[in-house]
């Protein structure tokens, strides 16, 4: 079993039960899924760029990404409806915990001038969004093979009802929030 999943079953559940006075273990918020999205605007001119992004996302998450397509045509961006413009991966279960563990313990500390992640990035429904400016912080990415530095969005979807519950859940997992 994964290290973070074990930690959730033993420590985190207990801590949250005490803090929020839940009557049942089933009320304790859990992480539902993690969505990693990479928007590739350059793919409009050059479709090879998207292939690189898909490859990198697959290395990072260990799962084949879904290529996202444009919903509308936007003339100023030279964009037609249905053009591939990004890639996303939805992680659940074992892979989700592995990715979160890697993100918290390896990748985030590798960010330059890292002071912690923002406490304000919750959406009001208990979900947390995190923007990463470069894919090089992940250990799977080889610095020499990177054609262009790209960022990505990481959304952690929880079953928590409030932001406070979600913040406490992620803090118990070891998410480095800013002081």
Swiss-Prot record:
Pfam families named among the record's database cross-references: Ribosomal_L5 (PF00281), Ribosomal_L5_C (PF00673)
Keywords: Ribonucleoprotein, Ribosomal protein, RNA-binding, rRNA-binding, tRNA-binding
InterPro entries: Ribosomal_uL5, Ribosomal_uL5_bac-type, Ribosomal_uL5_C, Ribosomal_uL5_CS, Ribosomal_uL5_dom_sf, Ribosomal_uL5_N
Keyword presence, rRNA-binding: yes
Alphabetical list of PROSITE patterns matching this protein: RIBOSOMAL_L5
Any one biological process term the GO annotation gives: translation
UniProt key word rRNA-binding: yes
GO cellular component: cytosolic large ribosomal subunit
GO function terms (MF aspect): RNA binding; rRNA binding; structural constituent of ribosome; tRNA binding
Function: This is one of the proteins that bind and probably mediate the attachment of the 5S RNA into the large ribosomal subunit, where it forms part of the central protuberance. In the 70S ribosome it contacts protein S13 of the 30S subunit (bridge B1b), connecting the 2 subunits; this bridge is implicated in subunit movement. Contacts the P site tRNA; the 5S rRNA and some of its associated proteins might help stabilize positioning of ribosome-bound tRNAs.
NCBIfam families the record matches: PRK00010.1
Family: Belongs to the universal ribosomal protein uL5 family.
HAMAP family: Ribosomal_uL5_B
Subunit structure: Part of the 50S ribosomal subunit; part of the 5S rRNA/L5/L18/L25 subcomplex. Contacts the 5S rRNA and the P site tRNA. Forms a bridge to the 30S subunit in the 70S ribosome.
Identification of the protein by name: Large ribosomal subunit protein uL5
């Amino acid at each position: 079993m994964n290290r973070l999943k074990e930690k959730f079953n033993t420590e985190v559940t207990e801590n949250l039960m005490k803090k929020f006075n839940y009557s049942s273990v089933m009320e304790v918020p859990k992480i539902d899924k993690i969505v990693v999205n990479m928007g590739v605007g350059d793919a409009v001119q050059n479709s090879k760029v998207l292939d690189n992004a898909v490859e990198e996302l697959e290395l990072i998450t260990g799962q084949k990404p879904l290529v996202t397509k444009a919903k509308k045509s936007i003339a100023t961006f030279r964009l037609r409806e249905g053009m591939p413009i990004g890639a996303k991966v939805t992680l659940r279960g074992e892979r989700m915990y592995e990715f979160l563990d890697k993100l918290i313990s390896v990748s985030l500390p590798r960010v330059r001038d890292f002071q912690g992640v923002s406490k304000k990035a919750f959406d009001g429904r208990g979900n947390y969004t995190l923007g990463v400016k470069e894919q090089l912080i992940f250990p799977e990415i080889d610095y020499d093979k990177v054609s262009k530095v790209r960022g990505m969005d990481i959304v952690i979807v929880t079953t928590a009802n409030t932001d406070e519950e979600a913040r406490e859940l992620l803090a118990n997992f070891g998410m480095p929030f800013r002081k």
